[in-house]
Amino acid sequence: MKVGVIGCGYWGAKHVRVLSSLPDVSLVVAIDAQSERIEPLRRMYPSALCVTSLDEVIDLIDAAIIATPPRSHAPLAKRLLQAGKHVMVEKPMTASTAEARELVALADDNGLTLATGHTFEHNAVVKHLRDMVTGGELGKIYYIDTARLNLGLYQPDVNVVWDLAPHDISIINMVLGSTPTAVSAWGASHAGTPFEDVAYLRLEYGNIGATANIHVSWLDPSKVRRVTVVGSQRMAVYDDMLDEGRLRIYDKGVQGAPLDGTVPMSYRYGGIVSPHIPMTEPLAEVDRDFVESAISGRRPAVDGQRGLAVVEVLEAAAESMATGRTVQLTPATDAVLA
């Protein structure tokens, strides 16, 4: 299969590297209008075809990965799907739910693969955490807290929610096996840019009685990548900044015991376990799954419907930040998150 990578900046260049190692990929085509990005790739991957325009190779390629700025995702994906190409789009899949729905319909109508680059859904730790939740090892899930913070990198065309929150929304949807029924959000810009650089989102998963809180920031002194899951039996913390023991399971909890109008609490302080989880490179899993899906015709692990589910939350968060109101959503069917 001949696969193009459109947009060869920091992340697109990584796709070129991974695709160059996949046995099912006979040709990697690197596409970027900026020649200064193309030249280093030409030297590093001499077997790759490096060009500055999609027009030069659209008839040559069988599939493409789009790693350009978010607002260009939908027009590029639509053009490729209309040309009969399989497509994977980096996060966020599109800049609106209307665009996302159009791409999903276009792929379905033409029997083409549409995948979304939610890398963490291919992460071994996140998969392990999902399996623990699904298996009931944490008990009933009360809430999930996530923090994705750093000093930068400010983006030129989207705010911090559209830049960082797709990771956390996709993780939470995957771990809970559900999508939100309501979204509220607050954000602000502190550095004189037109886009919010700090934001807080609250997601209500009303169909399972859980909530999630997301904190994203480009304006924080420390780099934080953390997911906390609190259940009735145990609690789990996934800290992606740790070199070892990224997932820790805490045998801790509380239990109320009403007596004479008071509620004395019983606290449980158990041990901490960090399970051994064999790690693979998530991006390699992303690209391998996309290529294999395009060849076989099977549904990709993270398809367009899952990308649409994330965009719906992002758009609801934008509406909530603008209006100050909670936005109601219809949860996705089980088939979307299977």
Label each residue range with its predicted role.
Residues 1-45:
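N-terminal Rossmann-like dinucleotide-binding module
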Residues 113, 120-194, 198-200, 247, ...:
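Predominantly a Rossmann-like dinucleotide-binding segment in NAD(P)-dependent oxidoreductases
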Residues 157-161, 273-281:
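A short glycine-threonine-serine/GTX helix/turn-capping micro-motif
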Residues 166-251, 276, 280-299, 334-338:
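Contiguous beta-strand/loop segments that form the cofactor/metal-binding neighborhood of enzyme cores
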Residues 28, 62, 142:
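Conserved acidic residues
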